[in-house]
């Protein structure tokens, strides 16, 4: 009866630790180009311009540039094409979705005191999608290393008595898996070894169950071979969103000052499925499937300070500071494993939901300097430069031994990165034509784990008076080396060459 119930209701296991790593940290520290079509048409080079709802998300002084109260809403069609190489295998995957990536309103109040130098004040509220996590790809090829090394590597680094992996009298396999995960002495790493054993991938050197409780040496049931055919499927979904309250003011219509108070929220799901097969007649394990479902939820806070100065009537200078974002993150993990010689009850393990203790993540702050020149009624050109030190990313509490190790890895692997954006606009009466280019340097010192991102944009807009309609097309490319598992015994990675294409439409109204 209990087994039947487990088919419908998962067991909750309070895990001790999940293997957060540098990749997880980088995921929540990067900013994508999101926002209005005008903003995207200029590749986000808006720090000294203002007068656009998404410009306010770069420099909070930008809302005071508005002459009238303003509201906008943006829809985007996001497309990703991944060319994936895994050893001798090559595959192309595509993903497409449509979403609401920006909406907001700014309210402008003019000072009725004509003798005051503070000419107007602005308040705005806006939602911006900072990151879109929707992606999927498939890698396949022949590897000289079997997935058995993933499990054996853990046993070689940590003495795990075989008795820990055994079922107690009357204990179900899913209960043992959950108990190991919630044990302060074992946790996630020993759970992986448990999976490897009950899937038939590894065995203790001493096979005598009456004497092998203290055995800590293990061997593989996969025969050594020159190559193993492997497939790895990756699918992720979700977003990183930001809701901002903005306050800004204008001094003599020459200096604009502003502040943003930001509430952040993360909703991220990742599914990976690994498959391996070999035809060696001496191999006991011939087919292996290993699946992981990760769900991440988080919330955070940050603030921004900004200023825009009119050096002349045509030349503008902008400066802004983004504080670190302080996140509180919760994670849940479901695992599944199988093989041709796995225990018949192995499937019940996928009914266990491992719930891990929440942790804090502090992302790095960012400085942005901007310069823009306005050619009267005929157009403009704008340039933004941003600097962010990714090595300042921190898992917290820093007193935690595991997080201290990961923070050292962050410091060793990540570096300071610059972002360059340039954009221009030509105005032909009611019609505006736009274009831009951006370069985002890799946050990694090696430049290979995640390469530089380079992209361009085109856009147009038409003003119907108080109503404006804008459209933008932007495309960017980036390479990456995706390591399948954070495990030195099985360090295999897939090479990705990704192209991101977006079409955005914005409707904007002056109130």
Model-derived regions: residue spans:
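Positively charged n-region of N-terminal signal peptides that target proteins for export
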Residues: 1-4
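Short, linear, compositionally biased motifs with a strong N-terminal bias
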Residues: 10-11, 67
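Outer-membrane beta-barrel porins/channels
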Residues: 20-34, 39, 108-511
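Transmembrane beta-strand segments of Gram-negative outer membrane beta-barrel proteins
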Residues: 21-46, 63-81
């Amino acid at each position: 009866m209990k087994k039947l119930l487990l088919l419908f209701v998962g067991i909750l296991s309070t895990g001790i630790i999940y293997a957060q790593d540098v990749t997880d940290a980088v995921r929540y520290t990067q900013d994508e180009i999101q926002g209005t079509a005008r903003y995207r048409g200029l590749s986000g080079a808006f720090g000294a311009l203002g007068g656009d709802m998404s410009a306010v998300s770069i420099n909070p002084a930008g809302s005071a540039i508005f002459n009238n109260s303003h509201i906008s809403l943006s829809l985007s069609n996001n497309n990703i094409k991944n060319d994936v190489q895994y050893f001798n295998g090559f595959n192309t995957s595509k993903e497409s979705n449509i979403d609401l990536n920006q909406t907001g309103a700014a309210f402008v109040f003019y000072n009725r005191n004509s003798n005051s130098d503070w000419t107007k004040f602005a308040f705005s509220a806006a939602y911006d999608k900072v990151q879109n996590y929707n992606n999927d790809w498939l890698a396949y090829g022949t590897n000289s290393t079997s997935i058995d090394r993933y499990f054996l590597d853990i046993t070689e680094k940590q003495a795990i008595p075989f008795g820990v992996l055994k079922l107690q009298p009357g204990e179900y396999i899913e209960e043992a898996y959950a108990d190991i995960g919630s044990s302060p002495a074992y946790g996630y790493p020993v759970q992986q070894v448990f999976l490897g054993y009950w899937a038939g991938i590894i065995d203790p050197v001493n096979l005598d169950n009456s004497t092998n409780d203290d055995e800590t040496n293990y061997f593989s049931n996969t025969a050594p071979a020159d190559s193993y055919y492997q497939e790895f499927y990756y699918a992720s979904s979700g977003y990183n969103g930001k809701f901002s309250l903005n306050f800004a003011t204008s001094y003599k219509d020459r200096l604009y000052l502003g502040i943003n108070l930001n509430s952040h929220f993360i909703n991220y799901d990742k599914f990976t499925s690994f498959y391996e097969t070999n035809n060696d007649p001496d191999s006991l394990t011939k087919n292996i499937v290993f699946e992981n479902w990760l769900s991440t939820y988080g919330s955070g806070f940050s603030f921004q300070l900004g200023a825009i100065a009119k050096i002349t009537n045509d030349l503008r200078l902008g400066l802004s500071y983004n504080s670190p974002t302080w996140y509180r993150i919760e994670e849940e993990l479901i695992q599944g494993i199988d093989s041709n010689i796995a225990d018949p009850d192995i499937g019940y393990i996928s009914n266990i939901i491992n719930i891990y203790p929440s942790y804090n993540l502090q992302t790095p702050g960012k400085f942005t300097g901007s310069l823009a020149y306005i050619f009267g009624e005929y157009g403009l050109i704008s340039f933004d430069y941003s600097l962010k030190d990714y090595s300042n990313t921190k898992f917290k509490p820093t007193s935690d031994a595991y997080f201290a190790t990961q923070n050292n890895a962050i410091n060793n692997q990540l570096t300071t990165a610059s972002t360059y954006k340039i954009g221009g606009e030509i105005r032909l009466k009611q019609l505006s034509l736009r274009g831009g280019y951006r370069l985002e340097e890799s946050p990694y010192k090696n430049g290979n784990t995640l390469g530089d991102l380079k992209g361009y944009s085109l856009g147009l807009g038409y003003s119907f008076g108080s109503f404006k309609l804008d459209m933008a097309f932007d495309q960017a490319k980036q390479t990456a080396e995706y390591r399948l598992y954070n495990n030195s015994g099985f360090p295999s990675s897939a090479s990705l060459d990704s192209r991101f294409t977006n079409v955005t439409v914005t409707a904007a109204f002056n109130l």
